[in-house]
Amino acid sequence: MSVALMWEARAVAGRGDELLAWARERTLALAVAPLRHETLRAPQDRVLVITWWDAAYDADLPELPEPDPDLVTRAVHRWRFETA
């Protein structure tokens, strides 16, 4: 089964590049490498990371942590999806 983990955060205004770099570094430093990963950006300094895993939906998988509170405007949003 294939599982996708999504992680989305919004940087403090003007710090989107810093959040993007932070997310890229943390994705590459995960304890176990995902099958695939993508890092995307959007207006309002938002960053989205999607990782794909060959695992059960409820598997214990490594996830990106919360960034420092001074880098983001709110708590990270997280979603987990399975292949339909």
Predicted regions and their residues:
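Short glycine-/aliphatic-rich beta-strand segments at the starts of folded cytosolic domains
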Residues: 2-11
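Signature tryptophan residues that serve as conserved aromatic anchors
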Residues: 7, 52-53
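A generic structural micro-environment signature
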Residues: 17, 25, 59, 77-78
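Glycine-rich beta-strand-turn "strand-cap" elements at beta-sheet edges
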Residues: 1, 35-48, 64-84
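N-terminal processing/targeting junctions
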Residues: 2, 26-28, 54-58
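Short amphipathic alpha-helical segments
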Residues: 11-36, 64-67
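Short amphipathic alpha-helices within nucleic acid-binding modules
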Residues: 17, 47, 54-63
